[in-house]
């Protein structure tokens, strides 16, 4: 298994293999999930003080806040997978 890394903005890179989901921070359940992670010390804020636009849920129970749109993160992931597939063929 190869390690896939993905840029979530401002030079911050996470392991794509360990991502569970990328969601918008607007809904009340996601806001509660962010607050719970903050209380447990499992929140990683990668926004550099900017507005949170994407919430990345990791398999380690960490929650990562990003200032990049969820669609942008997903697009970067899909482009990365396409490049990897072309390299194997």
Swiss-Prot record:
The lineage of its organism: Bacteria, Bacillati, Bacillota, Bacilli, Bacillales. The gene is remA. Regulates the biosynthesis of the extracellular matrix and the biofilm formation. Activates the transcription of the matrix biosynthesis operons eps and tapA-sipW-tasA. Also activates expression of the opuA operon, involved in osmoprotection. Acts by binding specifically to the promoter region of the target genes. Acts in parallel to the pathway that governs SinR derepression. Required for endosporulation. It comes from the Bacteria. NCBIfam families: MtxBflmRegRemA, PRK04323.1. Belongs to the RemA family. This is Extracellular matrix regulatory protein A. The keyword Transcription applies. Keywords: DNA-binding, Transcription, Transcription regulation. It comes from Bacillus subtilis (strain 168). HAMAP family: RemA. GO terms for molecular function: DNA binding. It holds the Pfam family RemA-like. Disruption phenotype: Mutation impairs pellicle formation, complex colony architecture and motility inhibition in a sinR mutant background. Mutant is defective in biofilm formation and also shows a delay in spore formation during biofilm formation.
């Amino acid at each position: 298994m190869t390690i896939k890394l993905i840029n979530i903005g401002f030079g911050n890179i996470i392991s794509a293999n360990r991502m569970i989901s990328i969601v918008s921070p607007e809904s009340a359940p996601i806001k509660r999930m962010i607050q719970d992670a903050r209380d447990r010390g499992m929140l990683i804020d990668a926004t550099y003080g900017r507005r949170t636009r994407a919430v990345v849920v990791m398999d380690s129970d960490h929650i990562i806040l990003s200032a990049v749109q969820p669609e942008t993160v997903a697009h970067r992931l899909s482009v990365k997978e396409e490049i990897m597939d072309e390299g194997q063929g």
